Amino acid sequence: MQMRSNDEVDRSIVQVPEIVQVPKGMLAFAKQFQEVMMMYTCAIREVKTKFEVLNDELSVRNKRNPIEMIKSRVKKPMSIVEKLSKRGQPITLESMISNLDDVAGVRVICSFLDDIYEVSDMIAKQDDIKIISIKDYIKNPKENGYRSYHMIIEVPVFFSDRKQPMKVEVQIRTIAMDFWASLEHQLRYKAAGEIPQFIAQELKECAANITNSDMKMQKIHSFLEDMDRFALK
């Protein structure tokens, strides 16, 4: 599909009959919003690259990849509006940038529990990364059983005329934690956010079982690593 320049888009809007013309102020806002979303997308790219580099390094050093998968997303406009409204904040770009830390999100899926803390520590130690906040929902799970390691970080993004610090939410979790969170989200969405108490309890028990499995897998992995170290001596 052939892409059109911004000038062509502007001209096409001007040529539309007056009754359906887009107000100039709205057009300017749309362009500003597009630019800000581009900046968040670039911030995601920077953070993903950092984790990919760490994964490559650790795959050589430890002979395995601690990161199974890296996912990312930029928050949808409607989600941004809903979150700002819920917090009683004005619906503006300035408000979004100031009040929302999770417009840009990166999710890192690790193999084992120890991998989560290893890669998060390595990211935190990088001198161009600023840690805004950390929430450890692994050691302190949410009431519904949700477990994950959350970081809000600020990363510099270099553009043609400036260096812009951008906030990115990073979620680090195991495969099992991601499996539970994904299914819980689907079920909650299907129930329109209202899950019966007995279902909520079942989900919480599933989360506890998954946690036990994660801990057992970590013990097995650590035991096998110890065996390898002793074999090399």
Label each region the model flagged.
Residues 2-44, 51-57, 168-233:
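An acidic, glycine-/histidine-flanked metal-binding catalytic module
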Residues 36, 40, 44, 77, ...:
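Generic alpha-helical secondary structure
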Residues 43-48, 52-89:
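Surface-exposed, low-hydrophobicity interaction/linker segments
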Residues 67-70, 96, 109:
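Glycine-rich, low-complexity intrinsically disordered segments
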Residues 76, 92-93, 196:
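General structural signal for secondary-structure boundaries
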Residues 91-101:
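Short, flexible, solvent-exposed loop/turn segments with mixed acidic/basic and small polar residues
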Residues 97, 110-219:
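Long beta-strand-rich cores associated with HINT superfamily self-processing modules
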Residues 102-106:
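Short amphipathic alpha-helical segments
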